[in-house]
Amino acid sequence: MFKITLKRSRPTGKAVRGTMTIPFTQRPVNDKPEQDAVLDTLENADFIIPAGTYPLERTWSPKFKKLLPLVGDVPDREGIRIHRGTIPEHSTGCILTDARGSACLDVLFNRLENYYDNEPIQLQILGQETL
């Protein structure tokens, strides 16, 4: 199982910044170890999901018309995704990353699908349990 970790910092206005770590080093490809990817995230302070551990899978997004990571089992919510974005006020619960973050997530899911028999992924969110 792969675990992605999101560590939130304190909110600044409507923005909650965080750092997402994607552990590429858990299994090397072609005997070449890779470094973890560390990404910046943004969330809307009014709509953040509770801290905890959630299943993460890549599914088709009708809104964005492409495959995107979907955060599962969020209490009283659905459709929470991780996608590119820079303005937290435009989000109603999704976790925003920059273009590099979206590309890193694509690489991770492609590797899981192509090399590791679709091994499950978990998203662990730490910090800011209640705002």
Say what each PLM segment does.
Residues 1-121, 125-131:
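Cell wall/extracellular polymer interaction/catalysis modules
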